[in-house]
Amino acid sequence: MVVSIWRYPVKSMLGEELNSSYLTERGLVGDRAYALIDQETGKVASAKNPRKWEKLFDFRSVFIDPPQVAENIPPIRITLPNGTQTFSDQDKDIDYTLSKVLGRGVRLMKANLDKPSYEEYWPDIEGLAQREKVTDEAMPPRTFFDIAVIHLLTTSTINRLRELYPEGRFEVRRFRPNIVVESTASGEKDFIENSWIGKKLTIGEDIVLRITGPCTRCVMITLPQGDLPRDLGILCTVAKYNQVNVGVYASVLHGGTIHRGDSVLLEA
């Protein structure tokens, strides 16, 4: 069963939890529709490089009006760390406003870059593909997705991680999924999503997803956001017990409206 649905209007900012949303081959309508672009480098601002962009987690973005299929992306409201709000359709100086808070020159853009890319910082943790290094990473053209349009996570994976590292606060918002599915898996299938890769998943009556691969995690899941503390132990646990993966990526084979409470059926 679908227990929560999440959309992030601006890449790497906190997003919004939804009761329902339309899903197309480009993911949840409006997800990662905007991003901040570093005026110095031209790269997408991403909390994957917290040395530059950790403050992004102090911002929250929501749509003023719900985005609709086949319509222009609506404007957004951004709540700044001090609680004040700015509106993309009203504040002519929004780039200056955001740049001043972040301490770097940025401009707010929609997802229309032909070759978007971002920087990723790899901490010195055993099991990561790189260690103590910053790399440049390409993104799919004209999107602000890292790899895939949908990230799916199960409750059983979160619960298992809590058992493995009880000192850590494993909460859904650390992992920024689009869809959270209730699961009671146990034993050898603690990370049950691993066995879903390559299979189809039907949600509700209309939606069909193809699970395309594991979601490899990065330093973002260790960063503070709201009342969640900084904790490198989160990433260390994920690296030690599940090859740095939490959840899976998916493509959309057939779209439709997804609701909280929808049934979820995995193909045999």
Named regions from a protein language model:
Residues M1-A268:
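Metal-cofactor-dependent catalytic cores
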